[in-house]
Amino acid sequence: MTESLMVAINFFSLLSFVITIKNAMDKLGNYITGKWIEGDGAGQELYNAVTGKVITNATTEGLDFEGMLQYAREKGNSALRKMTFQERGRMLRALALHLMDKKEKFYAVSVLSGATRVDSWIDIEGGIGNLFSNASLRRKLPDETFALDGDPIALSKGNTFMGHHLLVPKEGAAVHINAYNFPVWGMLEKIAVNLLAGMPAIVKPATVTSYLTEAVVREIVASGILPEGALQLICGSAGNLLSHVNSQDVVTFTGSASTGLKLKAHPNILAESVPFNMEADSLNCIVLGKDVTPGMPEWDIFIKEVRKEMTVKAGQKCTAIRRIFVPENRLEEVSKHIHAELAKTTIGNPLNEKVRMGALAGQGQREEVRSQVQKLLASSQIIYGSLDSVAVIDADAQVGAFLSPLLLLNTTPFESYEPHNVEAFGPVSTIMPYKNTDDAITLSKKGKGSLVSTIVTADPEIAKQYVMGAATHHGRILVLNAECAKESTGHGSPLPSLVHGGPGRAGGGEEMGGLRGVKHYLQRTAIQGSPSMITAISNVYQPHAKGIDNGAMHPFKKYFEELTIGDQITTQKRLITAEDIDKFADLSGDHFYAHIKDTDFGDTMFEQQVAHGYFIMSAAAGLFVDSYDKNPVLLNYGIDELRFTKPVYPGTSIYVRFTCKEKIAQEMKEKNPDVEFVKGSDIPKGIVKWYVEIFDDKDEAAGVGTILTMVQMKNKI
């Protein structure tokens, strides 16, 4: 028995289980105020996209939407705000591991939406990947419930008054109104960010595929990993939810531009100045560089990328390629090659291992796509596929929501309105010619703002010209060629570490993007005061703040828990000699002219031989390091923000002021019970940042930097 056949059999078993459960419960649950509740009334029937059969109903009628928000603010928000970024990050990682362990259940449910295994992988494991990615961001954040943003700002000549920026979690809830195409990824990519920031979420998935979102939320709730109130789910209408949001809440929307604009203009959103992030479907494009010819690797890369983006998820992706721009002298060749690739696409029941493209999410979606294609045909013609018929495997083409891939041709892109304004949200794309790169840039902008654009070229000049010209109208631009194609994540894949969103029609919003996304859920407040007061507030030592005299106790003798922000020592002095500089030059091999005593310094920035900056830093380490006895400091972890502010000449004495700046606890690595623990492979520890100030014998700063050490803990976390 083949592996793929076994997978199919397992799918059928799980699918039967899922359908049985749904038939027994009749309606999807809504998880609100800590319990599962069914809405009143029959609600909306939800269908199997492949068989056309009813699988369940969804309704939110009778639910207390105002109460949901209040519960999120009072329960979820208060619990999350008490957790540090490190704790929230570990929570996300635990949730990701739990969901990954349950993923086959989700794959079984995903089949109901018409998704193939590959389609579902993007949605399910791609969504879980967002949890892992955001969990790892904790390493860039403090071990606090808040964070500082940017650098300290000196506001006085005498260094007694300064400013900084503070980030704290908003006191409301994140309301996520999501699209139907990615019921798992759409939820997880958003809640991963707000949970790390310290805000709870109310998720409203698109009703048509909300059964898959509900299945995932049931596992999240069952895990007990999230604090009470951190996540609520409504399957069906959002009712009057937006009438009760306030300025401490954040609303996000993913879907059509028309629906998004209506929600964005909600009277309460405007009256309360509620942050609203909109990510709308857009007319994304791909450009074949004029340098690319048949036989080049980039030619095949282009053709395959178009085919992939037209058929994965049956073209139901907000990032899918809707417009294809090719040099006018290559239009016929490219069209034939895309035609040939699309002809290889097998369509039908996703449970059949031969199928490469499944159904649209439902009959309603298929009719909407057909309607939009009719509009496109006002200025274009179909050169591949049919609106009315499609050959399918193990399914009924009329009962299921199946549609043929449709490649349209438009030969007058500058004069035509439809290809740049009408989106058919399915396996549909329009190919159009251009004369030169400037034309391609202009055509790309006719989409009035897009989530993503790709240019396939081997020419760096063409790539640069296109990127610089098109960047104003795109949230992301992929430059694809033979060098990166094998490892490229592709045109249609937003990544958690990069921003997702776009200007204009694409919604004007921005989500994900690593720490950039987290800050959408944090209030940034400017704080002012003395350096010592800002240090006390932030738990990060600020320049010119008062230090804590450790007396005879060197801070390197303290365990992580014993160290206090502001612990400080001032070292003895060391005389820097010409002989020291010569020896360091020989030892390091750095014989830069400024470090050679025989140099003619007449036309230089220096008076005489000057010490290497790295020698001064090394000499500083010799002054502040407690070198003799074994102590809790495990190792030197690195240097941040090192600056040499004044030349040090032979005959100058230097000394160091050494201050505990910041502490970040680290969790122990998970032990494998089947592998014997090796001493030294991991011990309880944390990262300690030290503020190092190097002064000369005039008490003027010669250097400043932050060094990082790994320091042992007394206790595990």
Ranges and model annotations:
Residues 54-61, 76-81, 155, 175-176, ...:
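Short, well-ordered beta-strand elements within core beta-sheets of diverse protein domains
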